[in-house]
Amino acid sequence: MKKLITSLALVLVALSSHAITPLWMRDARISPDGSEIVFCYKGDIYKVPAQGGAAVQLTTQASYEANPVWSPDGKQIAFASDRNGNFDLFIMPADGGIARRLTFHSASEIPSAFTPDGKFVLFSASIQDPANSALFPTGAMTELYKVPVSGGRTEQVLATPAEWVCFDKSGKNFLYQDRKGFEDEWRKHHTSSITRDIWLYDTQTGKHTNLTNRGGEDRNPVYAPDGTSVYFLSERNNGSFNVYNFDLNAPQEVKAITTFRTHPVRFLSISDKGTLCYTYDGELYTQEPNARPKKVSVDLVPVSYTHLTLP
């Protein structure tokens, strides 16, 4: 018994000594209940408590995994993986496990959101332009599709690019950022006629409404929990990307939520309780309503050390 306890202690010491604090975490998304955050680091998907702590590695393939998206009930995660060449959609339990492949086209597919009922995953891909499309047919200009979570045939939702989709609770409307041209999405302080805007799409009427319509970059919209306002990322005010907010009844009245100066805020998401999550300078942050940003401490143990065998 003493030998077993000693062995366990040695393993714990080994794990703690090899834990690292990762930088440049990407694709962060907070869970619907606000308790956990998934993120990508060096091509794998991890999960960490929203209060900080040890990160659990969910994928261990030699391929590149990215863009994790929570299901509305927080029990599943959809993500993109290039394990078969191009990026395809996969879905796995939120605690990790066997991933099921959902898409099989040769084009790369990037997940954006689940429908509120949890039955479909929406994704962007350049698969099929309609005959009446006015867009130049190129792989850089995607269409919006959905695929059943249970697997099956994909269906085109929009023939125009619609990225970072976010549904309201009713499922009748969703927000998205557009794409008008081929400008590098990582370019800073871009101003032109092809910068991204935030749009509202009514699924009942098919109406698109431009909510920001300006020369600078506005992107990554998310609904507030009550559905009356929108949080988004913008480079307005001659600064780096920060979090902003406007009421849907008055989208021209925009207020700043964060005021970071040196680096851009990326990968905005929100929980059902209104906790914001994003990355800044390669690290994770959360922010409660009417509160200051809080850095999330992340301890990451490489998977080779988590598979140690006791003597």
Task: Indicate where each model-derived feature is located.
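A flexible loop/linker signature enriched in serine peptidases of the S9 family
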Residues: I20-P22, C40-Y46, A54, T59-E65, ...
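Short N-terminal segments immediately surrounding and downstream of signal-peptide cleavage
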Residues: T21-G34
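Hydrophobic h-region of N-terminal signal peptides that target proteins for export
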Residues: L10-H18
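Short coil/turn segments that connect the beta-strands within blades of beta-propeller domains
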Residues: D33-S35, D73-K75, D117-K119, S170-K172, ...
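Periplasmic/extracellular electron-transfer cofactor-ligation site
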Residues: P49
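Short, acidic, Ser/Thr-enriched surface-loop or helix-capping motifs
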Residues: S31, C40, S71, P93-A94, ...
